[in-house]
Amino acid sequence: MHTRPLGPSGIEASVVAFGAWAIGGWRWGGTDEAQAIRAVHAGIDAGITLFDTAPVYGFGLSDSLLGQALAGKRDKIILATKCGLICDPTKGVKHFSTNALNFDDDGLIQVNRHSGGESIRREVEASLRRLKTDHLDLLQTHWQDTLTPFGETMQAMLDLKKEGKIRAIGVCNATSQQMAQYQAAGQLDSDQEKYSMLFRGIEKDQLPYCQNHSMAMLAYSPLAQGLLTGKLTTDRQFALGDLRR
């Protein structure tokens, strides 16, 4: 497995990453926990070192499954997670509402974008507990909170880095203008964006910015959520709650 530097962070990560959204079950029609753990182990055996999760993936389930699967293997992998999406309608700006894990439940959970300093710290502490680790290799803002000053968000992450709780700082789903505002307050190591043969919009904005600022570009959904694998047929039936349905 080839590796590449994670921007200027000094971290080397595999060019193929394990995206952990699906193992959380939410919006993927549920999950088989034993199979999810086997998939993580298979990824490690194949040479994958970069594992990327987020608190909103299964509302903590993805984190918890990774924590179980990585027991005794933590020193072999680069663990990336995210912050900035919280289940608190009183803070930040609304991002979406969902039926969460039980898709037959009529009660909606509202998820807001909020990247205030204290909120980020709470999210990180909760992620560390679920993942059963004492540090995160990469912390990324999941979606940008336009109500919180970018400098406040960056300072919170810099403080966590100084404390040894994170090693590198990144963003996801950010414009070049937003990245520039973050970088006015501190160093960004990476940006994660949707990128595949079918979705190439970042080639005009985010990708050139990252190249010009020596940042790593992490691509999510590079196989268009399975569409480009060649394994999906027109008669494929997806479970209730699966975003591909």
Language-model features: locations:
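Short, well-ordered coil/turn segments that N-cap beta-strands
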Residues: 11-16, 47-49, 73-77, 133-137, ...
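Short, acidic/polar
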Residues: 30-43, 113-131, 175-181
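Generic structural signal for well-ordered alpha-helices
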Residues: 40, 63, 67, 124-128, ...
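Short glycine/proline- and acidic residue-enriched helix-loop micro-motifs
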Residues: 102-115, 245
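Beta/alpha (TIM)-barrel catalytic core signal, keyed to glycine-rich beta->alpha loops juxtaposed to Asp/Glu
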Residues: 3, 144-245
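Short, flexible, mixed-charge acidic loops at enzyme active sites
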Residues: 90-103, 232-243
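Conserved, mostly hydrophobic/aromatic
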Residues: 6, 18, 36, 51, ...
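N-terminal binding-site loop/beta-alpha segment at the start of enzyme catalytic domains
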Residues: 1-81, 85-89
